[in-house]
Amino acid sequence: MNTQQLAKLRSIVPEMRRVRHIHFVGIGGAGMGGIAEVLANEGYQISGSDLAPNPVTQQLMNLGATIYFNHRPENVRDASVVVVSSAISADNPEIVAAHEARIPVIRRAEMLAELMRFRHGIAIAGTHGKTTTTAMVSSIYAEAGLDPTFVNGGLVKAAGVHARLGHGRYLIAEADESDASFLHLQPMVAIVTNIEADHMDTYQGDFENLKQTFINFLHNLPFYGRAVMCVDDPVIRELLPRVGRQTTTYGFSEDADVRVEDYQQIGPQGHFTLLRQDKEPMRVTLNAPGRHNALNAAAAVAVATEEGIDDEAILRALESFLGTGRRFDFLGEFPLEPVNGKSGTAMLVDDYGHHPTEVDATIKAARAGWPDKNLVMLFQPHRFTRTRDLYDDFANVLTQVDTLLMLEVYPAGEAPIPGADSRSLCRTIRGRGKIDPILVPDPAQVAEMLAPVLTGNDLILVQGAGNIGKIARSLAEIKLKPQTPEEEQHD
């Protein structure tokens, strides 16, 4: 970036001119790292800390950031401001040191709000679909030559990054409701994909509280802003009269302003028509499977149409859409002869979905695109509280696959809850009489326990939000083949 471009960018956020050094505690998270990446490209001195290196920290170090793989008071020395993720506790030594030194400590969303303040902000919220919809909107705006800045919770595969600094006036960002911090944002346009019970500890277990928080988020829009909302979702339909802002609805419903019809999935692509008010019908080829992704695309098209983006640019972006990391992420197709001696192959797909609705959507997309495949799922429940709160829903959804292998619950810092563990969930599913789940007690046993259930015409879904993504990549690296002790030692 040349000096003139940097000066222009620094003038966008005038209140931050006195800020020189920004320190992130928990910088390795996708959301934190994305904001740090944008600020690094704007010319700020960036430092941060986390417990272990990952691709996010490597990318930031490539940009000149200083990363500490520990949490120590001296890490915040000389920082102008400290940005903290919701996963970091108040007694973290860096947070304590910052307070003692009277260094401002702010949440991630507060910094995102500062980036958005002097740009045309587009915020994408909702229980499911935020990351993919953010990537779709970003792809359309980039295809239209608008050079947006985007900050996403997942890897935007076309760009190879979670976030990118553009020179245009648009900032497109995923808005996180998990800790209610999206209330800091004041966008011009807000998408709400759906609203379901999740992260209920943030909302005192009160669903009405969660719904009101989404209304409060939408009321952060200016009176001339616009809310784009999925009318197929029963909670959104209920809340629409309370929004108090201009709205555009989308969905398969007949009364949607942007309506999806004639949906058909062929392999990994969706084909459908979008009907828009006062516009010609748009026949879409979307390079992403599933009816849920058609809805995500409808939201993106609604925003782009409102902005006046040319239909041809919209269609090009959706047809060439490369998706996001860990969202129906195709990792390869592998011959089974070296794995278990059988002929044929197995496809390997990695997916982040960890709520029953998300898992259900992934299964439906797999069944629609590959109806003849033996559907094998390796599932890792995420959080004991979520497993407890949605136990019956998980049991119902997971019976839809042909074979289920289940890892232990990924705790995400939570203490175990009796009856909300993987062994109990397997027992409940087995009792329903449809499938016989296989409990995998040790991640190191995955390949060994997976091989015997593969038939030679398989689609393997590796599903969950914990460390299971690393397991998926490991399976791809070894091409599903169980490793001998000698091979493991060599690795």
Curated annotation (Swiss-Prot):
This is UDP-N-acetylmuramate--L-alanine ligase. Belongs to the MurCDEF family. It comes from the Bacteria. One of its GO terms (biological process) is regulation of cell shape. Its main location: cytoplasm. Keywords: ATP-binding, Cell cycle, Cell division, Cell shape, Cell wall biogenesis/degradation, Cytoplasm, Ligase, Nucleotide-binding, Peptidoglycan synthesis. It comes from Shigella boydii serotype 18 (strain CDC 3083-94 / BS512). The keyword Cell membrane does not apply. GO terms for cellular component: cytoplasm. It catalyses: UDP-N-acetyl-alpha-D-muramate + L-alanine + ATP = UDP-N-acetyl-alpha-D-muramoyl-L-alanine + ADP + phosphate + H(+). Its EC number is 6.3.2.8. Pathway: Cell wall biogenesis; peptidoglycan biosynthesis. It is found in: Cytoplasm. ATP binds at residues 126-132. GO terms for molecular function: ATP binding; UDP-N-acetylmuramate-L-alanine ligase activity. Cell wall formation. Transmembrane segments: none annotated. It is an enzyme of class 6 (ligase).
